[in-house]
Design a protein with these regions (language model features):
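Charged, long alpha-helical assembly modules
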Residues: 617-700
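Glycine- and hydrophobic-rich flexible loops that cap the catalytic core of alpha/beta enzyme folds
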Residues: 259, 300-315, 319-324, 328-481
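Terminal end segments
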Residues: 523-587, 676-822
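Substrate-recognition/specificity elements adjacent to catalytic centers across diverse enzyme folds
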Residues: 10, 23-278, 283, 289, ...
Length: 822
């Protein structure tokens, strides 16, 4: 027995030793790719020495003899910290993910190839001015210099993910950066999804008057009546099965509910306590680990600029110089139209146009798939744009037999100069120069908020399609592509883009809300990203005569829900007082406890409170009950509560209370009936998910920010090292916006919000502050992978200074790039 025991101990010891060696070896391999920030590197294609000074928050301050060398340094710094992120985004826009990830990403690649964004990016290089092209070339050379260093010094292939996904890394090219701007346009444009959803809902609803309830317009003057979609595309079934967008974390395709959002506001000097203009900006995008944002400072010949960049794109997209500050918010401009193209019944290679049938423009495209046979696609284009497969965006449900769907979209411009406009903005010294730079900007359309030392302004930038006043659906639903009135007629002049310059009140801002109320076709959009946050913002701005940097920070971090304050009195009007206290343990008693909590609640979506969870679960269950009857399976796609819909129903606007009656039941249900039943539904769900002690609930447990790694975030064990999860306040409709997932077992997970926050005070520009939601590094073993995450969660910031001495005071490291001598 003793012998057996000794052998078991030896085997166990051996296994432990092997495990330790394995873990140690894996750590050693992964850690090889951690960048050495205190380093001197000899590189090619550099005219003079470049210094990358990383301050104590690891923000690189890049100094060089000329702009070309500075952009070279930015490329090197991006590749040091975010190489895997950069090449993954490049593969995404190229439609080449399947070369690395196999069949799991084929569906994503198929659709990206249809858009053909990378080919358009290569073509767009010809439209760029020499200065922009030189900057892109220099940036690419900086990225490639880091790749050369990795190969020469065997630095763990540059990122730990490279050890798991064996694929060659092609040199960076200027077109890659242009393509990433187009990829951002894809992620921020949701009108294609919205058009198809409106068409499907129109087909499903027996009463077309109810379409204005479930898909309400933002408050403002109305529009002319539109035809039913069944009239535009006859012969379609009332209901069709949903084909969801690709669920892969790598998918760039977003529903309209999860397209871009953002906040930005500015104060003139006479509304600022310091006497200088103020600006705040927090762009909202999907959360990832690392965040898409990367902080950097570039010391250009025109002066220093500092702010948020996106690795792969050599531009400060939101930030400031010593003279100008700028922020971006999604404009929600209607820059996409879906067209139903009729095939020639005698020749499927042709489609109908206003002048007769015409052949598709076609070419083959081959998708290489890891561990599988390659796939050959035939890409087809019409005059209106690329033909998209019916298997995406539910296009099959709204496309009659003998037809195909095509998309026109401003981002499909083969002479896209958006990146040149962004570079010109970095050199602008005044608001007027900043506005002028936006004329070259194409997509994605944004509201550009600007301040200089004297002036504040907001300008919508990006191409706005010129539509015919006789357009059948006004761009709100797919329309026949062979009718001339439905086709785009070019681009509206830049002067037609909304502009607000030095408003009399001294305050301006945007929360993706409706900015103008103009009749079609000069309307900008019928769909807007916000009707709620703007109300709270207006209240905060008006309650003070003068503002400070800190009051702007308070507004960015505000968690009071205007929506909760307005909806709860409406839906609970007949439920608050229901007689005597019910016995403990009964559903009636649980309902009374919930209502008592909500009655004393201020509407603050604080992570430590139970009321936000009760409220959110209640209104979610309420919308489900209201629409399930009429929409059937389509109701699942309305996965975020629309406050305007709930309000219309409970105020019975134009007969909207009809949604409260269940069509399949004999009794006539009322809206208070629906509210009571929905509250019971919500409490049952809460009990099953979080327990029955309502007073002990925490909103933050359900509303965790999910910064998940896009490729390894679902891998057991690794996900605990890669993913960054944080309990957070806020919600769908608070200024501290934490957009919820809306579906699945954790519908209130915070998946979309402000990955970057910045507030700039031009009375003392170097007192400006900014922060991102994870950290600068994309390497999970780096201290700088998540060091900013807790600051971000607590509402704290780091200094945003152009003071060179401050950057050099306690640097993380200084990387010197030295030109190679022949």
């Amino acid at each position: 027995m003793a012998v057996v025991f000794r052998w078991l101990m030896r085997i166990a010891t051996l296994l432990v030793v092997i495990a330790v060696i394995g873990v140690g070896g894996a750590y050693w391999l992964a850690s090889r790719s951690l960048p050495e920030y205190d380093d001197t590197v000899k590189v090619a294609h550099l005219s003079a020495e470049v210094e990358i000074v990383r301050d104590n928050a690891n923000v690189p301050h890049i100094f060089g003899e000329n702009d070309r060398d500075v952009f070279y340094g930015l490329g090197f710094a991006h590749a040091q910290d975010r190489l895997w992120q950069m090449i993954t985004m490049r593969r995404t826009v190229q439609g080449r993910l399947s070369e690395v990830f196999g069949t799991a990403t084929v569906r994503i690649d198929r659709l990206l190839r249809r858009f053909d964004l990378y080919t358009l990016s290569v073509q767009s290089l010809q439209a760029l001015d020499p200065k922009t092209r030189a900057a892109l070339d220099a940036y690419a050379e900086g990225v490639n210099a880091r790749l050369d260093q990795i190969n020469k010094e065997a630095l763990g292939r540059g990122a730990p993910e490279m050890l798991l996904f064996d694929a060659p890394v092609a040199p960076w090219r200027a077109a890659d950066s242009v393509a990433l701007v187009k990829l951002m346009a894809l992620q921020l444009s949701g009108h294609l999804d919205a058009e198809v959803k409106r068409a499907r809902t129109s087909l499903a609803l027996p009463d077309q008057d109810r379409l204005a309830d479930i898909l309400p317009d933002a408050p403002g003057s109305g529009i002319a009546a539109l035809p039913e979609y069944a009239q535009l595309a006859p012969g379609l079934p009332q209901f069709a099965a949903n084909i969801p967008l690709d669920p892969s974390p790598l998918s760039p395709f977003k529903t309209f509910d999860l397209a871009g959002a953002s906040n930005a506001w500015a104060a003139a000097r006479d509304r600022s306590a310091s006497g200088g203009t103020l600006i705040a900006n927090d762009p909202h995008l999907g959360f990832t680990a690392p965040t898409i944002w990367y902080l950097a400072r570039l010391e250009l010949q025109s002066g220093g600029v500092i702010g948020g960049t996106i690795p792969g794109i050599p531009v400060v997209l939101t930030g400031r110089s010593s003279a100008l500050g700028w922020g971006i918010t999604s404009s929600y401009a209607d820059d996409q139209d879906v067209y139903i193209e009729e095939l020639n019944p005698d020749n499927s290679e042709e489609y109908r146009t206003p002048d007769g049938f015409k052949r598709f423009t076609k070419r083959a495209s081959i998708i290489t798939v890891k561990d599988a046979d390659p796939i050959t696609l035939t890409l087809r284009w019409t005059d209106n744009g690329p033909v998209l497969p019916g298997s995406h965006y539910n296009l099959a449900a709204i496309t009659p037999p003998g037809h195909v769907a095509a998309l026109n979209w401003t981002a499909l411009d083969p002479a896209d100069t958006s990146i040149a406009a962004a570079m010109q903005l970095m050199e602008a010294k005044t608001v007027e120069e900043g506005i002028a730079s936006g004329e070259a900007y194409i997509a994605p359309s944004q509201n550009l908020t600007l301040v200089d030392v004297n002036t504040i302004a907001m300008k919508t930038i990006g191409a706005l399609p010129a539509r015919d006043a006789a357009h059948q659906s006004q761009g709100r639903m797919p329309t026949p592509g062979w009718i001339a009135a439905n086709r785009w007629q070019g681009r509206l002049p830049y002067s037609a883009n909304p502009e607000f310059l030095s408003p009399r009140g001294g305050i301006l801002g945007n929360t993706n809300n409706k900015t103008v109320d103009r009749p079609f076709p000069n309307h900008v959009s019928f769909l807007w990203g916000d009707t709620q946050r703007i109300q709270r913002w207006r209240s905060l701005m008006q309650r003070r005569q003068v503002h400070t940097r800190d009051s702007f920070i308070e507004a960015q971090l505000d968690t009071v829900s205007f929506t909760a304050r307005s909806l709860l009195p409406l839906i609970g009007a007949e439920l608050w007082f229901t007689g005597e206290t019910a016995p403990d343990g009964t559903p009636e008693r649980q309902r009374q406890r919930a209502l008592t909590l909500l009655a004393g609640w201020s509407g603050e979506m604080n992570e430590h409170l139970p009321e936000p969870l009760i409220y959110a679960a209640w209104v979610r269950a309420l919308q489900e009950r209201l629409i399930q009857d009429e929409l059937g399976a389509l109701a699942q796609e309305y996965d975020h509560v629309d406050p305007l819909f709930i309000e219309r129903v409970f105020r019975d606007v134009d007969g909207a209370a009809a949604w409260c009656d269940v069509l399949q039941s004999a009794p006539k249900e009322t809206c208070p009936d629906m509210a009571r039943l929905a509250l019971d539904d919500a409490l049952v769900w809460i009990n099953e998910t979080w327990g029955s002690q309502l007073e002990s609930l925490r909103w933050g447990d359900a509303h965790q920010a999910t910064h998940d790694h896009q490729t390894l975030g679902e891998v057991p064990v690794l996900r605990y090292f890669m993913n960054i999860r944080q309990s957070t306040s806020g919600g769908d409709n608070t200024l501290l916006r934490g957009r919820t997932r809306g579906t699945g077992p954790d519908p209130f997970a915070n998946v979309h919000g402000a990955g970057f926050r910045g507030v700039y005070d031009f009375a003392d520009p170097d007192s400006s502050v900014f922060v991102t939601s994870t950290g600068q590094s994309g390497h999970f073993l780096s201290h700088y992978y998540d060091d900013l995450a807790q600051l971000w969660r607590r509402g704290e910031y780091i200094p945003m200074s152009l003071d060179e001495d401050l950057a050099r005071a306690a640097p993380v490291g200084i990387t010197k790039l030295i030109p190679e001598t022949p």
